[in-house]
């Protein structure tokens, strides 16, 4: 996962990349904290997260700490800080899938 994450960190930034009806973006908050987001067009020019995962990279251990998960397109929408093991497993799987999608998007550009 870290290799794919390094690739995404190198290839994406705050400028949205459009691909097949979705927008991909990596927002950087500080040296180690990011949000990886896939969004779709919403009403009146907004972007709706589907999903957005905020995370922190722990440099000493090269581990990823998940800070929040947001998906406003699903019903009911989800917005939470992963705390339980089930929530962490859910976010980790979603994050790995998101990394794969980002990798495919950059490969097709």
Predicted regions and their residues:
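Short, surface-exposed coil-to-beta transition loops
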Residues: 19-22, 47-53
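A short beta-strand signature
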Residues: 36-38, 51-55
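Short, solvent-exposed aromatic-acidic interface loops
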Residues: 41, 66-78
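Short hydrophobic/aromatic-rich beta-strand segments that constitute the beta-sheet cores
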Residues: 35-36, 64-68
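Negatively charged, low-complexity tracts enriched in Asp/Glu with abundant Ser/Thr
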Residues: 1-42
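A short, structured loop/turn motif at beta-sheet edges
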Residues: 26-31, 56-63
């Amino acid at each position: 996962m870290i290799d794919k994450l390094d690739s995404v960190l190198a290839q994406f930034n705050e400028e949205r990349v459009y691909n097949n009806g979705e927008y991909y973006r990596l927002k950087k908050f500080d040296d180690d904290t990011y949000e990886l987001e896939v969004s779709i067009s919403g009403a009146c020019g907004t972007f709706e997260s589907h999903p957005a995962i905020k995370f922190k990279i722990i440099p000493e251990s090269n581990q990823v700490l998940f800070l929040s998960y947001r998906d406003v397109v699903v019903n009911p929408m989800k917005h939470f800080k992963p705390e339980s093991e089930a929530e962490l497993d859910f976010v980790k799987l979603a994050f790995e899938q998101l990394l794969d999608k980002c990798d495919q998007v950059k490969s097709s550009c």
